[in-house]
Amino acid sequence: MALAASGSALSLTACGVIDGIGGGDSSEAPKKGDDITVGLLLPDKDTARFEKFDYPLIKKEVGTLTDGKGKVEYANAEASPDRQSQQFQKMIEDQVDVILVDALDAKGIASDVQKAKDAGIPVIAYDRLAQGPIDAYVSHDNELVGEVQGRALVEELGSKAASSKVVMMNGDPADPNTGLVKEGALEELEGEVNIVKRYDTDKWSPEVAKANMKKAIASVGLNNIAAVYSASDGLADGVIDAFKEAGASKIPPVTGQDANLDAVQRVVSGEQFMTVYKSFLLEATNAAKMAVYKVQGRDIEFDALTQSSVDSPTDEGIPAQLVPVVALTKSNIEETVIQDDVYTVKQICTPEYAADCAAIGLN
């Protein structure tokens, strides 16, 4: 798949093309009016995007699509699969009309998905592919995320890539996205660089990443590590802290994912080489549309949003919407997160980063 241009270009798809499709209610699907309840289950509060972007964007879009009559019943699992299961079951008991779930434990949540199906409640997997009889899936192309990270790292290392010692800091093995991202990264890295250490990171914990990076530094040598493949911005934060505490005079290229504000600031300052920008706006608004369209039986519009399909360990041919991604570096901050109104220059260029911003013409 070709690399996407920018989130601003992608938003045309959400705001223009889909909105232009006429209502196509299916006579076979149960239809409801605008007075609907969308259950939203998000995984944690450590990842900044969920509370700051995903929940507010989904809530706003549901309101827009239902003339203010629809509502979102929201719960955050705070990194506890057991808590998420309890929250899921409560939403079934509350008889919400549809559930959007970003599963902490994709396999473990399958029984809850089945209970929802038995209760006649559609379930849409959000951001991570849950197992069980889900009705649809909306996320980014996670394999492409890894490819973008790996390709950017190889290009940055240039002619020294083949002899470069690289540490891989992968995500939580319980997260189905982790395997896809890792697979994409390895397609670009294997045979191009020397991967000397590989770590999985329980619950995507920055502290675990930091501890593992300290082990890698002790084993490989501070000055012998040419780059670090980090699967997310949170992990990159821990990796960079480990280098700082080890007394590194210069931090080698470190990748990331999510375009968190602190990560964008690290990119500006040069502490972090790149991050993967994924349009929260497009993912969240399309998820809200899919949920509302599913409940209201608007099959033509629903199908227009789910023209891809994916397989899970339990189901095949799941209707899916895969949102493209883009590599964010110093060179395209203005054309991505600023142009898409994710952050303002003022938010990025605080006094601490003012000089770095000026150096790259960000003002």
Annotated model-derived regions:
Residues L12-N363:
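A residue-level marker of the well-folded mature domains of exported/periplasmic proteins
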